[in-house]
């Protein structure tokens, strides 16, 4: 059966068809559903499993894991657990994940903060990204205007661009675990086949072909085939592997 809340109400633990919350709703315990749409506010105390799509244009707080096919967020979503999406995660709002995020395709046009690892086939970021662990994908495209902090990156093709703001002289500062970050920082390493980066600070970059663009600060560059370094980039050591 369908469940709909347009005022204020609660949904008991159980299995449902479509769930729609346009008011203020509380989900009590673990639920399974075919689809969920939240345009108001919702709080879920258990694991949420959705066979179809979860769409959030309001505000959601989840205490445990979110398991779904697709997840669209144009509002705000927070979870104390992890997110597993077999297909797509798309956000133009904000998502905060205390655990990890795993999906087929990740599209970020807002702000994403994941305390642990991100694992996906394809990732495209045109907003703000914080990943406390490993960002792992076959294809990684990051286009950052503000602060970005990632533990480490692994992928086949890695492209990182920094688009300067037209009306603001300085980059916005973001915080992660009380650390102030300006620009794009990868704390451990970037490893891939084809790597092309700009304005990145990283201890080690290792790949088959590596292009280090303007504004980069790299301690160790490792390559197996070829490399290029912009005249306004800083590289401490170069090593053929």
Please give the residue ranges for each predicted region.
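Extended beta-solenoid/beta-helix repeat architectures
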Residues: 1-241
